[in-house]
């Protein structure tokens, strides 16, 4: 099931879920399976020419684009680059990563997103900005279930397969 709010439906139609979250409710059983980096992405023309955006503090002159479900990505990034008080010209929230990347490709601002979304997109109009800056996302992908669901063999097998798959990366 790929619908939103999968964690709230555990035990009510879902045996387990893979969720993107900062943390899990302690009443749930959870295993972090993957944690991504935050990338800054913009139109190629933003990093070219005499007015190129080349320094993190220049983000203050730009519109920042953030996925609505990953609202803390910009805060985590600005803290990591040592600019905790940096405020952009504007912040636009998107419900779709694909729409956010298209807006970035058209030069509407700088997208703050997870590395894996950019890797899957492959658009020559986009460039990773501030490539020398590595910032871990505050969000992780979690395997989650109600503790009693671990009594079900398919749930245990799925969990074990996920853990094995991502430990090899």
Where are each of the predicted segments found?
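Central regulatory/effector-binding core of bacterial HTH transcription factors
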Residues: 1-26
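Beta->alpha turn/N-cap motifs
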Residues: 3-4, 20-23, 42-44, 113-117
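Alpha-to-beta junction loops
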Residues: 12-19, 38, 104-110
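Ligand-binding "clamshell"
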Residues: 25-30, 34, 121-131
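Flexible hinge/capping segments at coil-to-helix
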Residues: 27-65
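Secondary-structure junction motif
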Residues: 63-82
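Hydrophobic hinge/microswitch elements
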Residues: 85-129, 136
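A late-sequence structural motif
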Residues: 132-169
